[in-house]
Structures are given as structure tokens and as C-alpha cells.
């Protein structure tokens, strides 16, 4: 798909300064490792042993209430989940719940359309759980951004993937470029 999007930009007459994927070790890896280090320094990352139901197809842990009546992932019905116990790093998402709600309700963080804003606020009425942000090298098959200071772990893809917006403009590898382009005036996130 990456090649198709690259070709589409050319067909539309668009040009770009950098074409980047999450596997980019020159730009994205250092940016993601810097993000990790900043979060760690702020006390937002901790390591703990975790046991849960794991869907290999989604590469995600699920709570029982997130599964269908047969105890299967909705995306992969018919495939049994694995009970996995491993030590991972977690991000203290719970620490930021009230700040996120305030940013949205005050209008400082705009979400459109209104129905999506209401969807997010409805979700935020429940306590946010801290989220696992790493996988063992074995589970990750040594793919992904290495966790700084721990050669047994890789960043979970959804921790580093969103950082690609910043890494593309220099975060973690070119401060002059980054300070010129960030923060962006508008962020567009597509949902398929």
C-alpha cells in the first residue's frame, strides 16, 4: 500500500519534503526513542508484569467484555485468543483523563464533526486504563523501534506510529526543521 500512496501523490501533482514509513531508522526511530525518553522522564512510563487475552491477528490484548459471545475478537472470529503473560512497559494514560476532557470541553482541542467529539467525550466518562506500549522482542519478532535502555523490548506499534507526524518534520533528528514546522496548524487524521 505504501507504494500506491506514493504514486497517488505524484498523480495528484503533490510534492513532499520527505517520504517516510514507520520502519525508517534514520528519522522515525530516533524520534520515537526521544518521545519515549521524554515520557519516561515525566514519570509516564512504568514496567509491570501483565497477563491477558491476546489476539495474534490484531497484536492486541483484550478485556473479556471487548470480545464476542464466543470469547473471540470481533475482527478474527473463529480464532482463539492466547492467554499471554509477559513483562511490558505501560503509559500512564489515566493520569491525563481530566486534562483531555478539559481540552475538549473548553474548545482548545477541536474535534469535528460534533458526533465524533461526543463519541470521544462519552468514552472518557469511563476511567481510562493505562496502556501497554511495548512488546517483548520475541512477540514483536524483533520488528519495530527498540525501547531505549532495554534490549528485550520493542515499542508497540501504536505508541510510535502516531509520532510519525512529528518525526517527519524533524522531531528527534533536526531541531531547526522541527521548530519551523511544529506545531502544525491543522492535523487531519483519517479513519477508515
What are these regions (language model features)?
Residues 20-22, 30-34, 77, 82-192:
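Structured secondary-structure scaffolds
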Residues 10, 44, 60, 105, ...:
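Residue-level marker of positions within ordered structural domains that often coincide
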Residues 1-45:
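N-terminal Rossmann-like or analogous alpha/beta NTP/dinucleotide-binding catalytic cores
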Residues 13, 43, 59, 144, ...:
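Glycine-centered flexibility sites
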